[in-house]
A protein has these predicted regions:
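Aspartate-rich (DDxxD/NDxxD/DxxxD) Mg2+/diphosphate-binding motifs
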Residues: 19-37, 65-76
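Polar-ligand-bearing catalytic/cofactor-coordination segments
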Residues: 190-194, 231, 242, 248-250
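Non-catalytic, topology-defining segments of multipass membrane proteins
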Residues: 1-10, 44-165, 237-280
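Transmembrane alpha-helical segments that form the membrane-embedded catalytic/substrate-channel core
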Residues: 8-20, 49, 53, 97-101, ...
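Membrane-embedded alpha-helical segments that form the functional core of polytopic membrane enzymes
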Residues: 1-18, 37-51, 172-176, 210-220
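C-terminal membrane-associated helical module and adjoining short loops/tails
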Residues: 114-186, 190, 195-196, 200, ...
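Histidine-centered catalytic micro-motifs
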Residues: 16-25, 53-65, 182-189, 219-235
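Membrane-cytosol interface motif
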Residues: 32, 36-42, 193-207
Length: 280
């Protein structure tokens, strides 16, 4: 029961992150103040600075797979070999990589492995957004520093143990491989980086048991419609299914990266292709 509880809490924390992602796009609520207040709170609960992520995520959208994309370090280069991703996910589940995840969400420089250049997302934004991000990071730190003391004040030792075991522990273990695998399913092992229709992927969450399980674990709040999200990032998550149907009806997704989840997983877990020798 304890393990099942940890898994379910980690899945729920991922769902909260997806909502904070919508808030980062100003799409959680039309009223911007409410959008940002709730987006900050939702992100804060799982250790994410929504305002910092807003800056970082803009670079991902504007420079997908380009030299300024801070997310390439996460999803780029796949397939990387059968064992590579399993080792990464095992390290995530063991909590070994959580510090890297939260460094990313706090705007730490990301290393582009192709150019060996550090991408500094917080240098490429307005003074106001930079100030908002700085304030938000401070609030996230205060929130998580205060949480165990609040839990103790409310329920003593049992409260602190509940906070640690049923919130902090799944946040640094179960949540981590979910974040990685979902990001790789969205962009890993795509067919053509030059086209917006093939550099991002929509994963079907209908039509088979495997797809439905993927919806529950990896793709809450319609985040599986990632190709459509990259084409039209101003569309809120609850409109993405209708957008997908419209684009399919018009033939706009012919040849696009739209796959069943098992097909995506086969691709990202495939053996690394042989390296081409220069001039060959």
């Amino acid at each position: 029961m304890l393990i099942a509880g940890l898994v379910l809490v980690g899945i729920a924390q991922h769902g909260l992150f997806i909502l904070s992602h919508d808030a980062a796009h100003y799409r959680l609520f039309a009223q911007r103040g409410l959008n940002d207040a709730l987006g900050r709170l939702i992100g804060m609960s799982s250790g994410v600075s929504m305002c910092t992520y807003r800056v970082t995520h803009r670079l991902h959208h504007n420079n997908l797979y380009g030299p300024e994309d801070p997310d390439t370090a996460i999803h780029g280069g796949y397939p990387r070999g059968v064992g590579y991703l399993w080792r990464k996910l095992a390290g995530d589940l063991a909590g070994l990589n959580a510090w890297k995840t939260y460094a990313y969400f706090f705007g730490a420089p990301a290393l582009n492995e192709d150019t060996q250049r550090a991408i500094r997302p917080l240098d490429d934004t307005s003074p106001q957004l930079r100030a908002d991000a700085r304030q938000d990071r401070l609030l996230v730190v205060v929130f998580h520093a205060a949480a165990p003391f609040v839990a103790w004040a409310l329920a003593g030792t049992s409260g602190m143990l509940a906070w640690f075991g049923l919130w902090l522990l799944p946040m640094v273990t179960v949540l981590q491989p979910i974040l990685r695998l979902r990001a790789i399913c969205e962009h890993g092992a795509v067919t053509d980086l030059a086209s917006p229709l093939t550099a991002a992927r929509t994963n079907r969450t209908w039509g088979s048991a495997a797809n439905w399980i993927g919806r529950f674990v990896l793709f809450p709040h319609h985040v599986n419609y990632h190709l459509e999200h990259h084409l039209y990032p101003a569309v809120p998550h609850y409109r993405l299914p209708a957008l997908h149907r419209l684009l399919v009806a018009k033939g706009a997704l012919d040849g696009a990266e739209v796959r069943d989840l098992p097909d995506t997983l086969r691709r990202v877990f495939s053996p690394r292709p042989p390296r081409m020798n220069p001039g060959s």
